[in-house]
Swiss-Prot record:
<feature type="region of interest" description="Disordered">
    <location>
        <begin position="669"/>
        <end position="704"/>
    </location>
</feature>
<feature type="region of interest" description="Disordered">
    <location>
        <begin position="887"/>
        <end position="1037"/>
    </location>
</feature>
<feature type="modified residue" description="Phosphoserine">
    <location>
        <position position="985"/>
    </location>
</feature>
<feature type="compositionally biased region" description="Acidic residues">
    <location>
        <begin position="242"/>
        <end position="261"/>
    </location>
</feature>
<feature type="compositionally biased region" description="Basic residues">
    <location>
        <begin position="1023"/>
        <end position="1037"/>
    </location>
</feature>
<feature type="compositionally biased region" description="Low complexity">
    <location>
        <begin position="690"/>
        <end position="699"/>
    </location>
</feature>
<keyword id="KW-0053">Apoptosis</keyword>
<keyword id="KW-0597">Phosphoprotein</keyword>
<feature type="compositionally biased region" description="Polar residues">
    <location>
        <begin position="938"/>
        <end position="954"/>
    </location>
</feature>
<dbReference type="GO" id="GO:0006915">
    <property type="term" value="P:apoptotic process"/>
</dbReference>
<feature type="modified residue" description="N-acetylalanine">
    <location>
        <position position="2"/>
    </location>
</feature>
<dbReference type="Pfam" id="PF00619">
    <property type="entry name" value="CARD"/>
</dbReference>
<feature type="region of interest" description="Disordered">
    <location>
        <begin position="235"/>
        <end position="270"/>
    </location>
</feature>
<feature type="compositionally biased region" description="Pro residues">
    <location>
        <begin position="994"/>
        <end position="1012"/>
    </location>
</feature>
<protein>
    <recommendedName>
        <fullName>Caspase recruitment domain-containing protein 6</fullName>
    </recommendedName>
</protein>
<feature type="compositionally biased region" description="Polar residues">
    <location>
        <begin position="963"/>
        <end position="984"/>
    </location>
</feature>
<keyword id="KW-0007">Acetylation</keyword>
Amino acid sequence: MATESTPSEIIERERKKLLEILQHDPDSILDTLTSRRLISEEEYETLENVTDLLKKSRKLLILVQKKGEATCQHFLKCLFSTFPQSAAICGLRHEVLKHENTVPPQSMGASSNSEDAFSPGIKQPEAPEITVFFSEKEHLDLETSEFFRDKKTSYRETALSARKNEKEYDTPEVTLSYSVEKVGCEVPATITYIKDGQRYEELDDSLYLGKEEYLGSVDTPEDAEATVEEEVYDDPEHVGYDGEEDFENSETTEFSGEEPSYEGSETSLSLEEEQEKSIEERKKVFKDVLLCLNMDRSRKVLPDFVKQFSLDRGCKWTPESPGDLAWNFLMKVQARDVTARDSILSHKVLDEDSKEDLLAGVENLEIRDIQTINPLDVLCATMLCSDSSLQRQVMSNMYQCQFALPLLLPDAENNKSILMLGAMKDIVKKQSTQFSGGPTEDTEKFLTLMKMPVISFVRLGYCSFSKSRILNTLLSPAQLKLHKIFLHQDLPLLVLPRQISDGLVEITWCFPDSDDRKENPFFQKPVALANLRGNLESFWTQFGFLMEVSSAVFFFTDCLGEKEWDLLMFLGEAAIERCYFVLSSQARESEEAQIFQRILNLKPAQLLFWERGDAGDRRKNMEGLQAALQEVMFSSCLRCVSVEDMAALARELGIQVDEDFENTQRIQVSSGENMAGTAEGEGQQRHSQLKSSSKSQALMPIQEPGTQCELSQNLQNLYGTPVFRPVLENSWLFPTRIGGNFNHVSLKASWVMGRPFGSEQRPKWFHPLPFQNAGAQGRGKSFGIQSFHPQIFYSGERFMKFSRVARGCHSNGTFGRLPRPICQHVQACPERPQMMGTLERSRAVASKIGHSYSLDSQPARAVGKPWPQQACTRVTELTEATGKLIRTSHIGKPHPQSFQPAAATQKLRPASQQGVQMKTQGGASNPALQIGSHPMCKSSQFKSDQSNPSTVKHSQPKPFHSVPSQPKSSQTKSCQSQPSQTKPSPCKSTQPKPSQPWPPQSKPSQPRPPQPKSSSTNPSQAKAHHSKAGQKRGGKH
């Protein structure tokens, strides 16, 4: 029956009528769909470039059908609201409205595809939350949302039930009942006041809907009722710029199709369902792309395969099917052909007939033609399906071709992101060094170990100009041809938008002594440039990673509206100082941009306007951008990091590190060979090998303490906890919704707070509130990854009112402050709740610490954060009573020497690691500390270790800190004291020999382990000691 058709079937059946409607004004419906987030910015740009109205309309319908039934339903409603006459033409309004209960509506705060609480095309209130203040004797006015105040009390209207553990005062109950008619209707409303045990009712004329408001109510089912309860807040501290009061706990109104739901747990459940549904859709798209490319992730491509393929096909071979694209890319990259990526698109010249056939295939959803695959999708699929050895070769050759390299590779199949550290290990940078009084010599250094500032470029919302094209112009010499370091949207052929490569973070390095930079010496010292693909609102993890490691972040967007303000309310003052905004020329005269600059106190160089005109305008644009970059590079607050340094932070954020997986595979292979010792035909030989192996392991505590623990833990690691922490399990806490409350976030880089990044499980710019989502975390879920949209939760007005409070909290923070040894002082308070406390508790900690740090930095610092190498040495202490070790390969090998076999690294192994590895044999810890921890979460384990005073005393003897001026002797004592508690005899034989070299890596970890008597520590001594250690460590990397 026609009345039972799905929305996609309706579109298919009425395609001709819909095309006639769309042809009149396709741009209007296109703009509306984009504003409702039903189509992405890339899809909008692709359709915008199509000049033929009929083709544009046909492609739009196809795109909507591809996105599923929910999108089709919202598209039809959006179409009827934009073109009211379309409903009469098609006669479909009744049929469309019938599907409202079958297609889940995108409710406020729960949908990642729409920022509206109702259907598209409806005029919304100013914010997703309906906020009304009124005095005891005044009427409720929902139409104007006027603010009234009583001398003693103010009220807040919400649709969610009040928190059970909070007190309620004078809770009015407002019941709104209304009916929906075809043309217009009146909406009687009864306000029921419950006060002091008495009930009385008043009619409120202001609740009658106007004409525009009626259009917004047609999507609500008939006879629906919304019960609104209120909580009372009285917080004089939250005073905004406009002089109105703001409140810490803001809640939202949610309308369901049948019965209203007010439980925060149910809302969280719907968020989980949306998240899982989105993940499943991405997995399906990923599998489709791999199928199109004829690739299988379970069958890794090896370098020998590429060589054999090249020999069989020859140098003049051209791809003939989509399955040849990946091989074409690999062949040309291995040959260091700079057209490797271009060949993916320009392998075949299309004539007019071929173009028509291609368009017809797209319209029939046959989109797997070779021209339609985005080259970045091919790159990501190729890297994910390649063996680690091939990945290293591809990375090295891409670097030689001056291509941007994938730093964070999106893994859509597993909903993760991978730091490609191991794949970059073989990249070598040749440098010319001139010794005093001697000739110039060329030296080689691994690129992953070179420390330099990082500048990131991200897109916020819609941007009409190409960010990657601007970067190519910036990095290419003026008199030479523009080199495509980054692929951009101006591609020569018709391609689909990115399918699996959104969230990709690419990186390129600029060296002033390079041959291609000598003619355009813009950067006077080495710098790394990172580029995030896609809208940062959809990739919160990657954006947080870049905020941590970058010395400056450039935001590209057309204009600054509520959505942009909502995001920036999560940025602290020190983070804002590192942010630069590139806007379109239309935003120059806008009032929003002026308010934005005034409120955030942006310097002129932080707000750039990109003119789209002749060559003169383009030259002025580049000059302005270069001036901003010069300001960054000459800043005294530059933070220099290496790719190796980024690994610790990546693990904390739930980002996988590829070399961890490689080490685990290596362990499994070697362990499998040893454990299959009784195989037929090799039984005796295997048995003797295993026996000699166990004998050598028994002797290793005396001869090679570092190697023994490594081998013993390798076998246990095979059956222990997985190496990779899932993103949705024990992940750092994103802003989540709990009972209508949303956690406020302050994006603050870790060094702003006075210590290196990579300290804790949660990000350093995350500032949780007391009402943390314990339930969601208990279920191991997090909704921030690729789904968190701040604009859903906060309006621009809330940002204005919140800004002063948030920025006030960071007023003492200074970007680029040198690390301070706060962790030595915080350990005087060994007990600390699992979740971070309130701001008042943070102030209490601040008073104990005695440093002028911002409030946002206190919760993070209060953990007593281990420094990077300290975290490596401390993490193996946490063992269960059964002897099951929690260890990953990256913890035992945090330095470049870790590439070598264990037996060959005894002399190079830092002494601090040797002590820890011996410590794991005899030092037992509380098994309860294992709860909620993960092997990738170094800081989480360290934090748990601090919470037990006995553990602190057990792990660190008093003589350790009493002689800070003798690091070697104190370190020797630390190494000896740990195993002596259970195995005194091995301890005597493991004393370091005087002739054994002491690598500089071991020294920075000396003052970092927790001290039982840290309150008596002299801060100046500790600070000087840290500075000295930090300098020595910096020379190593």
